[in-house]
C-alpha cells in the first residue's frame, strides 16, 4: 500500500505584503489599490491577507457576498467590492454589511435601489464594463451609456467606481489586454 501525505502550503504573509508594497510603488502617486482576495485569497487565507495588507490596500475585492461578510465579521472596515453576480435575495445583507457590488444591468441597479430605500440606506455599487471578457458587464455603446446615466440618477445608489476584467492578462502578448484597456478608457472619458 502506498503512503499518502497531507499537502500543505506555508504562506509567507510578509512576502505578500512586500510584493504589494513593491507593486504599489509602480503606480502613480494617489493611485488606489484594491487587493483581490476572492476564493479565500486564492487559498492563502482572506482574513489573514486582508489584515496583512491593511496598511497598503485601499479596498478588497471578493467573488461573492459570503466572502465580504467574512471580512466584515473579522473586523475589516475598508471598502469591499463583490466582483461578480449578487443574487437579489442577498441585497439586504449586502447593504447592511456595507459591501459594494458590481452592477451590470438597469434592472439589477433598480432592484438594489429599491432594497436600499427599504433599509433607509444608500447602496454602494461599481459599474462593470465588458470590454472583452464576454461574461458580465455593460458594452461600450450608446444604449449602455444611457442606462448608466439612468443608474447614476437613482436616489439610493452611490456609484463608487467603474471596472473591467482583463480576459487574457496572463499571456505574454498584451495586444488583447491593451485593446481592452483602450475600450475601457474610451468609454469612461
Protein language model features and the residues they cover:
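Conserved PLP-enzyme active-site core in the AAT-like
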Residues: 26
Amino acid at each position: 500500500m502506498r503512503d499518502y501525505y497531507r499537502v500543505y502550503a506555508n504562506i509567507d504573509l510578509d512576502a505578500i505584503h512586500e510584493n504589494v508594497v513593491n507593486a504599489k510603488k509602480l503606480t502613480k502617486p494617489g493611485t488606489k489599490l484594491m487587493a483581490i482576495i476572492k476564493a479565500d485569497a486564492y487559498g492563502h487565507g482572506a482574513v489573514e491577507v486582508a489584515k496583512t495588507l491593511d496598511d497598503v490596500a485601499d479596498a478588497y475585492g471578493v467573488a461573492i457576498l459570503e466572502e465580504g461578510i467574512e471580512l466584515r465579521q473579522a473586523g475589516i472596515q475598508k471598502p469591499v467590492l463583490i466582483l461578480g453576480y449578487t443574487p437579489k435575495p442577498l441585497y439586504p445583507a449586502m447593504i447592511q454589511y456595507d459591501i459594494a457590488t458590481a452592477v451590470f444591468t438597469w434592472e439589477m441597479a433598480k432592484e438594489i435601489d429599491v432594497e436600499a430605500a427599504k433599509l433607509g440606506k444608500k447602496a454602494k455599487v461599481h459599474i462593470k464594463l465588458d470590454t472583452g471578457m464576454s461574461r458580465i458587464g455593460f458594452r461600450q455603446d450608446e444604449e449602455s451609456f444611457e442606462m448608466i446615466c439612468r443608474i447614476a440618477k437613482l436616489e439610493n445608489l452611490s456609484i463608487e467606481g467603474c471596472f473591467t476584467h482583463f480576459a487574457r492578462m496572463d499571456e505574454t502578448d498584451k495586444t488583447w489586454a491593451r485593446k481592452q484597456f483602450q475600450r475601457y478608457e474610451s468609454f469612461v472619458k
